[in-house]
């Protein structure tokens, strides 16, 4: 269900096709993430000055914030090729070996969802990242021997939404680690105006800011909302996205002024109505919503935590006073006994 939401940060097929035309190609075009961009600018200049590949780089943060786009920008700035893959796509050590042996000098290997690499594949990746060498086994049984192949110097750029799931040995092999934060409304406004120009959409500043304010701090969502509002303006209006058109379109999409949709409100109401405001365990909450645990952790929670609507505790999730106020539900202070009782739901 979460992937069908207009405010999901996960990329659908339409997003993947459209995003290619909207992605920035250079750091100068990249909007937001100023600290990360400046750190990468220095790293790129230093690497090019020494004639070396970029340090292995890890990008982490909620989905939809531009990790893949930033990897492409790094390749363009370094003037090298980039090969794209993902943790789940590398099923066997042979898959990784094929990728590594096809890399040219200074190329970038981008691994999305790198936390989903299995341990056997990580063992192959370690010497490749450290020594630019690939250890392969030749033969079987007692006569098997290890053969080391030299690889050209290259850069691994890893992306993950779940930094804590990376093993320490893998995490330690990245010389450059950067967290991508949610975007400000001002930054998202700039993204809307830029995307509107590329898509040939007429959008007033007021309309653009309204879309930006409801995009949950996420560029992928702001671009998706822009396309949905564009459709509404084309069919219902004169094709121009004004403030009123944006508000009407977003109201029909059930995206409120903070960027919450009906699924977010349903999650908060479940905690409040079914579990007395919490604490409630993650697996129990997921079961009550017929959702996957990963979807709640990766898709729902980051923005609700950012808004201060949700609190994580050792005993489970708690809806905050702000969540009650947003839903128009009277807030009742939880007693210690109630918290202890609800704590039994923690898993």
Curated annotation (Swiss-Prot):
The keyword ATP-binding applies. Its main location: cytoplasm. ATP binds at residues 22-23, 64, 67-69, 130-132, 173, 183, 220. GO terms for biological process: DNA recombination; DNA repair. One of its GO terms (cellular component) is Holliday junction resolvase complex. GO terms for molecular function: ATP binding; ATP hydrolysis activity; four-way junction DNA binding; four-way junction helicase activity. Its EC number is 3.6.4.-. Residues 257-347 are annotated as: Head domain (RuvB-H). DNA binds at residues 312, 317. Residues 184-254 are annotated as: Small ATPAse domain (RuvB-S). Has 3 domains, the large (RuvB-L) and small ATPase (RuvB-S) domains and the C-terminal head (RuvB-H) domain. The head domain binds DNA, while the ATPase domains jointly bind ATP, ADP or are empty depending on the state of the subunit in the translocation cycle. During a single DNA translocation step the structure of each domain remains the same, but their relative positions change. Belongs to the RuvB family. This is Holliday junction branch migration complex subunit RuvB. It comes from Roseiflexus castenholzii (strain DSM 13941 / HLO8). The lineage of its organism: Bacteria, Bacillati, Chloroflexota, Chloroflexia, Chloroflexales.
């Amino acid at each position: 269900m979460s992937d069908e939401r207009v405010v999901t940060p996960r990329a659908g097929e339409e997003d993947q096709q459209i995003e290619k035309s909207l992605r920035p190609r250079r750091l100068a075009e990249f909007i937001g993430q100023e600290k990360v961009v400046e750190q990468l600018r220095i790293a790129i200049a230093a690497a090019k000055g020494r004639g070396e590949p970029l340090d292995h780089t890890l990008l982490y943060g909620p989905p939809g914030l531009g990790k893949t786009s930033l990897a492409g920008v790094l390749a363009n700035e370094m003037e090298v090729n980039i090969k794209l893959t993902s943790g789940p796509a590398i099923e066997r050590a042979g898959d990784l070996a094929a990728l590594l042996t096809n890399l040219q000098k200074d190329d970038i290997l981008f691994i999305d969802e790198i936390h989903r690499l299995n341990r056997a594949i990580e063992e192959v990746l370690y010497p490749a990242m450290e020594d630019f060498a690939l250890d392969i086994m030749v033969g079987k049984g007692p006569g098997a021997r290890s053969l080391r192949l030299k690889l050209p110097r290259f850069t691994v750029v890893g992306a993950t939404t779940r930094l804590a799931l990376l093993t320490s040995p893998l995490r330690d092999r990245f010389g450059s680690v950067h967290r991508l934060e949610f975007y400000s409304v001002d930054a998202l406004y700039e993204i809307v105006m830029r995307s509107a120009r590329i898509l040939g959409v007429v959008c007033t500043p007021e309309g653009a800011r309204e879309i930006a304010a409801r995009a949950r701090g996420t560029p992928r969502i702001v671009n998706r909302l822009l396309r949905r509002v564009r459709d509404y303006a084309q069919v219902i209006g004169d094709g121009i996205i004004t403030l009123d058109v944006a508000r009407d379109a977003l109201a029909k999409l059930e995206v409120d002024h903070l960027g919450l949709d009906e699924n977010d409100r349903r999650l908060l109401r479940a905690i409040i109505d079914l579990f007395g405001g919490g604490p409630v365990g993650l697996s129990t909450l997921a079961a009550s919503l017929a959702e996957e645990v990963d979807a709640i952790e990766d898709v729902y929670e980051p923005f609700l935590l950012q808004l201060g609507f949700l609190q994580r505790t050792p005993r489970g999730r708690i809806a905050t006073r702000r969540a009650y106020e947003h839903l128009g539900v009277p807030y009742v202070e939880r007693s210690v006994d109630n918290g202890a009782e609800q704590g039994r739901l923690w898993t």
